[in-house]
């Protein structure tokens, strides 16, 4: 179980209810995620914008129910206004989130775990309501190292994620809170993906075979 900040608990955003209501009308909750990609050497700027379509997987700590997901999931102890999506470390997004952060990772070997914090922007166009939603902030990666083996020292990336993301989570249910787990939340998100998508995230020898 990883700690989350209880000081200065954030209040629900005033736009939260309308945002979720609008997204519930979409056939597929697609949005455009924009981040900053390292520019080529000798470029007049350090970064170039990159955008791609992603699927909104719910707010962090509010994993949507899925009857086909057999993974263990957390109790609904927290809620937030932090949009989530799933990606593969081999894709460009994790590198961009790390490279444009204060840590300035410049190699993929430095982006294999939790961390990041680079600037980002997400845009939803809800044609059913003719409303555009835009959220700006910092993006963080929650990776398999988010809860290492007992006795292992946490990486700086893990500490950053738990501090920055944890401070934006608010308690909605005290009962069972001690059992809430970052790793369980991550596994739950993986289990909510379709079997085909889960298979694309893994090599043949990896544990994703257990989800078939």
Can you describe what each PLM-predicted range is?
Residues 1-212:
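Binding-site signature for planar aromatic cofactors or substrates
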């Amino acid at each position: 179980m990883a700690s989350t900040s209880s000081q200065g608990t954030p209040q629900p955003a005033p736009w939260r209810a309308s945002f979720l209501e609008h997204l519930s009308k979409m056939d597929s909750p697609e949005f455009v995620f924009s981040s900053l990609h390292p520019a080529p050497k000798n470029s007049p700027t350090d970064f170039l914008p990159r955008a791609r379509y992603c699927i909104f997987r719910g707010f962090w700590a509010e994993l949507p129910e899925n009857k086909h997901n057999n993974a263990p999931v957390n109790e609904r102890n927290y809620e937030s206004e932090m949009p989530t999506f799933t990606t593969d470390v081999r894709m460009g997004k994790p590198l961009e989130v790390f490279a444009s952060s204060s840590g300035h990772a410049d190699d993929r070997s430095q982006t294999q775990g939790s961390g990041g914090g680079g600037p980002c922007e997400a845009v939803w166009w809800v044609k059913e309501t003719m409303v555009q939603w835009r959220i700006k902030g910092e993006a963080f990666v929650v990776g398999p190292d988010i809860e290492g083996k007992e006795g292992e020292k946490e990486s700086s990336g893990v500490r950053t994620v738990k501090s920055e993301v944890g401070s934006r989570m608010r308690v909605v249910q005290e009962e069972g809170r001690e059992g809430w787990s970052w790793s369980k939340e991550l596994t739950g998100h993986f289990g909510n993906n379709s079997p085909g998508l889960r298979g694309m995230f893994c090599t043949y020898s990896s544990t994703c075979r257990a989800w078939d």
